[in-house]
Amino acid sequence: MIRASDISVRLAGRQVLHGISLDAAPGAMTAIVGPNGSGKTTTLKAISGELTPSAGKVTINGRDIASLKPWELALKRGVLPQSTVISFPFTVREIVRLGLMANGGEASAHGRIADQALEAVDLAGFSGRFYQELSGGEQQRVQLARVLCQISAPVAAGEPRYLLLDEPVSSLDIRHQLTIMRLARQFCADGGGVVAVMHDLNLTSMFADQIVMMKAGRIRARGAPKDVLTDETMEAVFGCRMRVSVAPAHDIPFVLPQSATM
């Protein structure tokens, strides 16, 4: 389990997270949602170890991440950032295989693992292409393939591993949004855990087990999608009155932007 205990973060002298506590269990997808500037990405960076909290602590499978060496942390969780700028002319294959540096293992298997990761994100046949030649959505999927190479097994040495994804479907068409979300769900079904920053509330409702809703650096609601996505919380957090509906056959809430009033 990833556990954040009362963490606060200060950036440039301003406190941006105020006492955040959350548990992200293996076998489950935790989605962090909220308006722009609410602290979602900062929370993900804090639980990944990229940012050091000014107060509180984060543990992964019971170990304080502050006590882990970078290579140890790299074996326990993989991180997909919001965007990645690469200035050098790397091929897709070279980018994806960077994820294998933490894994070790037989070098002879690296090509197969990279090809499997590219196939999983629907980029089979792209390995020889230059990264800069790809569309934004294709680049995003290349980076996810790299993360999958790093954390290729959801469970290793008897411990769950985690994918930390910052807006993993923001640049994708609907088909590939579903592909990536189903891939994340399968990672959970196989024993790993996923924490994802999300903006699409309908995709979040379809795939997440737990929603953590943030506003102004604080958690305003948490729980199952049907408990968090309510008319009241939507208005309180996003500042617009909106009707949350439920599909009768599946008991999954969905939000129609057409119903919003400002």
UniProtKB/Swiss-Prot annotation:
- The main enzyme category here is translocase
Q: What is its EC number?
A: 7.6.2.-
Write out the entry's keywords from A to Z. Answer: ATP-binding, Cell inner membrane, Cell membrane, Membrane, Nucleotide-binding, Translocase, Transport
Query: What's the main place this protein lives?
Result: membrane
Superkingdom of this entry's organism?
Answer: Bacteria
Outline the subunit composition.
The complex is composed of two ATP-binding proteins (HmuV), two transmembrane proteins (HmuU) and a solute-binding protein (HmuT).
Q: What is this protein called?
A: Hemin import ATP-binding protein HmuV
Species of origin reads Rhizobium meliloti (strain 1021)
Q: What is the lineage of its organism?
A: Bacteria, Pseudomonadati, Pseudomonadota, Alphaproteobacteria, Hyphomicrobiales
Gene symbol here is: hmuV
